[in-house]
């Protein structure tokens, strides 16, 4: 493809319009390198990707990938055995996160058939182990203490030393307050110092680090603090060395995967570019064109992408039509129409949507050539005509039957008669070699050429005779006409002068009258066509509205069913609470035995409806997210640290990467990071009472509620107390942990309400403290 045409059509400015919709630097890089191609299959693949992205957005309106930096240089540094900086590791961490999210998104994608994008999604790799390791660096770029035992130890020592240093300074501050200009601890050269009055500088033993501008205050590091600060400085040096070692270790883990990570970045960048194309298409009301099997083109309501509020025009370039000649005066929009065709074709062959209506067709040309604008060369001392002709000669040498040529004001810049003759001769040569060409001209001689010559068609830009302004409407099949007499008359030129001029060009006046009639017929046909299009658009909008209403109705119905189920459950809960009160009163009257009470409660609980709706698509989908999966981010309950699941082991155990450490965890020892966002159904679990060795206080049992959801915990607690009563337990332990306090408070509330609980309180500090509640039954 000739580079010059991309400059003349300002293709770079068109590409800039896609920038706001991009989220990744890799997508930006791919867009920057984007140029027209002549491979029909590849262009069709681009269009298929775009259509599939549109289908994704129908189901997922907010599909996004997240901001990604270009990691290509970082991967090159890894290949050269260099270690990555914290910032580079953060960028790789983000890449791993987005890769994992893309894999999960694709795994959960429903109701969308993908072909082209399927290949992209399935090539994206997830790296849970690497993702877990890089949790050692938080999003602010801080290396966490759990990254290594050594770093944690060093930071603990630093904290202790800093505390001791502050304590010592506070003591000195109190003892020598009389010698200080201010009662505060300052910092100079990274050292903690005291602001001492210069007159008392010898009263405070230590090292002088600075002096105030007035000289009245000296900043002294007390001698007693020097050794502490030196130890602290050494520890800070050790911390930096350990962080460097951790960065090296993380880089070593990434190094074998540099190629895969680079490939992931490209795949995500390409998906981002496809997403940007779709968003541009929606914002600009653009469309994916159909690719013709031949060289025919059909642009429906085509607009120039770089013009504010452009006039939309139709263009039909049949396969057997070789040349379209746009005639008429300047400033009517001929050049804009020429560029509109050129840009539509260039954008389409670059895999971009075009600013035209759905149903538009484009061809695939091996070469697109143009001679547009003023090409005068001062350096070569060439005239405008010579410059244009030099370029035209080069185009004629290169073009063939698989080319598209655009000429603006062909033959201009020389004697009108000679220019018109040259223009006709050039167009005739292109017609004979079957090279699709669109040319603009203001030479009237070319109108006759367009009428008399086969496979050549005239066209023009419409002119409003009332306002004396161009309408920028493209009139295909109608040659341009002169409006000089009408304009002169309306501007006030004497009528006898206008008539005398018309008499001198009587023949041309007749031609203009015929052209005017053709224009009128064309305008009427266009109005009828636009009316038909409006009706079609109204029908399309109606169909979309009906579909939207149906979807909203279905969604509302599901919501109402959920609401009804919740209301029913609330009613049953109230009934259960009331029954609990009644049964308790009966028990106090000794009218029922404990096992009979529990059996009655069980029968009442059977009245509770299932919480979930089996037909509810929303809850069905949420259910899929409930089970842990390899690559999920987790929070380890015991440490409160974040990690990533590596592999599933037996007995519901998982291998997880937390910082640089691998752990084996049970499913109840961690929680999924996004668990709170997911709708889950409570599982029915049998509550097992674990008897402990009898003590002086009688048999005891223990219930562990850590990691349980509120409703699940309350169900298990209720069943547990029932079982304890049946087993004549006098005391039970309920382990709920500290956490957010929600379960702990709920346990207390339940025990206060239960008539069979005599008393309860937190366990001793050595037996769980506020993380465990001991209840006495009776």
From Swiss-Prot:
One of its GO terms (molecular function) is rRNA binding. GO terms for biological process: mismatch repair; negative regulation of DNA recombination; rescue of stalled ribosome. Pfam families: MSSS, MutS_V, Smr. It is an enzyme of class 3 (hydrolase). Its EC number is 3.1.-.-, 3.6.4.-. It comes from the Bacteria. ATP binds at residues 328-335. The keyword rRNA-binding applies. InterPro entries: DNA_mismatch_repair_MutS_C, DNA_mismatch_repair_MutS_core, DNA_mismatch_repair_MutS_sf, MSSS, MutS, MutS2, P-loop_NTPase, Smr_dom. Keywords: ATP-binding, DNA-binding, Endonuclease, Hydrolase, Nuclease, Nucleotide-binding, RNA-binding, rRNA-binding. Residues 703-778 form the Smr domain. Belongs to the DNA mismatch repair MutS family. MutS2 subfamily. Endonuclease that is involved in the suppression of homologous recombination and thus may have a key role in the control of bacterial genetic diversity. Acts as a ribosome collision sensor, splitting the ribosome into its 2 subunits. Detects stalled/collided 70S ribosomes which it binds and splits by an ATP-hydrolysis driven conformational change. Acts upstream of the ribosome quality control system (RQC), a ribosome-associated complex that mediates the extraction of incompletely synthesized nascent chains from stalled ribosomes and their subsequent degradation. Probably generates substrates for RQC. Homodimer. Binds to stalled ribosomes, contacting rRNA. This is Endonuclease MutS2. It comes from Streptococcus equi subsp. zooepidemicus (strain MGCS10565).
